[in-house]
Amino acid sequence: RLVEWRPGDQIVLERNPNFWKPGLPKVDRLVFKVIKDPAARLAALKAGTIDFTTDIPPSNLRDLEADPNLDAVFRPSFNVGYLALNPSHKPLADKRVRQAIAMAINKKAIVQAFWGRLGVTDGHFTPPSMKAFQSPKVTDYEFNPQKAKALLAQAGYPNGFDLELWYMPVSRPYFPTPKEIAEALAADLSAIGIRVKLQTKDWASYLADRKKSPGFQAYMLGWTGDYGDPQNFYDPHFLGPIADLFDPQGKNLVIPELNELLVKG
């Protein structure tokens, strides 16, 4: 039963003596503490002031496994991270430019550098833990900077173009170190002539402003599933009118053909 709730601080639950099944719950008290900073969560865990936590940055895994007082328990991930491209920014309106960006980013190297063995690349918009819903016909773009350069030239940008790339100001499982990951993305894009300017702002403004007309040119975000159905990943992003991406007018993305497929699915 709930005995205390301090928003942004902690929730305290105590054993309900009137629970319908004798012997349960098996613990007398649970305290859920809000510790936003990953480093602070890890410090609290190592100090013994909390018993367990989640969403520790992958870079701390070796440190965790080396501590005899701690156990690292692995579970399948249930989230995806993505780079959203705004088609109202002229270069990004061309499919070849978007394809070039996909081919210019060395996703496997970035995953290895920032997630280690805790992350994978995937061409689907659902996590690999939902493989039963993933079609083998869907493949990811290859890492091919030369082909990416050729596509940019075909689209009329042989010398590249300027791009503002926004990164999240907070850590999330899908982007545990967003600034550093954004820097890696910028380095890959610079290799094909795209001149990236990194931007960020406070989290509330980031979420609100990313798709307000004209919207961010490109931004990093992700999604952690609420339940085990691909609809929970696809609908919030692509099913109009609730789609949480943008179109050239800064409104929700609405693609009739895609809507029809999602509804049928």
Regions found by a protein language model. Give the residues of each.
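Gly/Pro-rich hinge or "lid" segments in bacterial periplasmic/extracellular proteins
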Residues: R1-P25, R29, D37-A39, Q146, ...
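Structural transition elements
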Residues: T121-Q154, R172-E180
